[in-house]
């Protein structure tokens, strides 16, 4: 769209609105284009259909404007309109309309859009006139197509002979480059995403294989350790039974000697003595082990004076009174803070009972009840004292 400025009043006007502005502004004799700055006197502005773009205006000396396909088609369409104006068989009313149409640079090339544009821009609402104008355009376009078709028919026989050419490496390279250039941004993005997914899968497989390799030696080590332990147990079992076997062998030899009788009786008696000695040894070792067990149990037993305080807890019960007394006796002056006493008693409870069902709130309630209701314990503010 071309814009002009009035040299008389300085108002900017579209090309379509120039005639209206001239009727309002009496001193308007010259119009200048906003983009290129050229001056147009009288009706010369009508020839100024298209002006330079902003890129051409501000691009500099080395700027080369890109040719758009739509512009080329529009110029061909306007050229066709100018040719139709010169034809003699066109009615004067239609010729005037064609002259008005040629002044525009945005003429549609399809029937429905063209007729709608005529109604809005040129204010032509009669359907008969619109049909006449479009019929002239359609006849001109069909005649051009008929003129262009014969050369294509003549060129067909030559095209029927197929020429087989061996594609060279250069042509293959150029075709590949062209196909890559033709790819859209979306296709390139999809290819990148696919490549990333493949790389991630490969990395996962490699990590999985490395983990499997690392796990196999660990399993072997575990199996070896288990084998060593089993071998040690078998060796320990094998070292124990030979005494029994020897004893059984001694008994068998005695029975054989009794059956056979004769000079082997002295030897049999000696064997029985050795077997008896070997039988007595395990008993001695058992007695020693029992003695050691008693020694281990002795430190845990309470003294006679403390026997009443530390009552042996029955199965499934915890001796709250005894543990509280024991903790208070260990404290200086048989006095300790409630917080420390609670911490020690509950820790002892968990160590003895291994009970995970009762909550901490229930344990605290039991602890507070035992302290407050027992007359042997005296609670003063935050401290507990054992009364003698």
Curated annotation (Swiss-Prot):
Residues annotated as binding Zn(2+) 2: 33, 36, 48, 51
Residues annotated as transmembrane: none
Mapped zinc finger ranges (C2HC LYAR-type): 1-26, 28-52
PROSITE patterns found in the cross-reference section: ZF_C2HC_LYAR (PS51804)
Compositionally biased intervals (Low complexity): 140-152
Principal subcellular localisation of the protein: nucleus
Compartment(s) of residence: Nucleus, Nucleolus; Cytoplasm; Cell projection, Cilium, Photoreceptor outer segment
Protein's name according to its UniProt entry: Cell growth-regulating nucleolar protein
């Amino acid at each position: 769209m071309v814009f002009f400025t009035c040299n008389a009043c300085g108002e900017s006007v579209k090309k379509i609105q120039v005639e209206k502005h001239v009727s309002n502004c009496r001193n308007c004799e010259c119009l200048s284009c906003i983009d290129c700055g050229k001056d147009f006197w009288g009706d010369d502005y009508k020839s100024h259909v298209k002006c330079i773009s902003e890129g051409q205006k501000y691009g500099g000396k080395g700027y080369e404007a890109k040719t758009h396909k739509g512009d080329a088609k529009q110029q061909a369409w306007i050229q066709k309109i100018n040719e139709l104006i010169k034809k003699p068989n066109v009615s004067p009313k239609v010729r005037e309309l064609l002259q008005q149409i040629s002044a525009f640079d945005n003429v549609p090339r399809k029937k429905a859009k063209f007729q709608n544009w005529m109604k809005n821009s040129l204010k032509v609402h009669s359907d008969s006139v619109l049909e006449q104008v479009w019929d002239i355009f359609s006849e001109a376009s069909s005649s051009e197509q008929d003129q262009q078709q014969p050369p294509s028919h003549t060129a067909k026989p030559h095209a029927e002979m197929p020429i087989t050419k061996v594609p060279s490496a250069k042509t293959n390279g150029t075709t590949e480059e062209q196909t890559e250039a033709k790819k859209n941004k979306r296709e390139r993005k999809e290819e990148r995403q696919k490549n990333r997914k493949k790389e991630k899968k490969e990395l996962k497989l490699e990590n999985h294989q490395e983990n499997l390799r690392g796990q196999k030696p660990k399993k072997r080590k575990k199996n070896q350790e288990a084998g060593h332990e089993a071998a040690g147990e078998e060796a320990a079992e094998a070292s124990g039974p030979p005494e029994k076997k020897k004893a059984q062998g001694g008994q068998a030899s005695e029975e054989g000697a009794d059956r056979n009788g004769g000079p082997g009786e002295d030897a049999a008696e000696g064997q029985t003595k050795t077997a008896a000695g070997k039988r007595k040894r395990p008993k001695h070792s058992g007695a020693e082990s029992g003695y050691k067990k008693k020694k281990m149990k002795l430190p845990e037993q309470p003294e006679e004076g403390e026997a009443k305080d530390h009552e042996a807890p029955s199965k499934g019960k915890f001796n709250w009174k005894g543990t509280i007394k024991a903790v208070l006796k260990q404290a200086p002056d048989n006095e300790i803070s409630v917080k420390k006493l609670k911490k020690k008693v509950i820790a002892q409870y968990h160590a003895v009972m291994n009970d995970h069902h009762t909550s901490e709130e229930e344990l605290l309630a039991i602890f507070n009840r035992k302290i407050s209701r027992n007359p042997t314990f005296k609670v003063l503010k935050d401290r507990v004292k054992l009364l003698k």
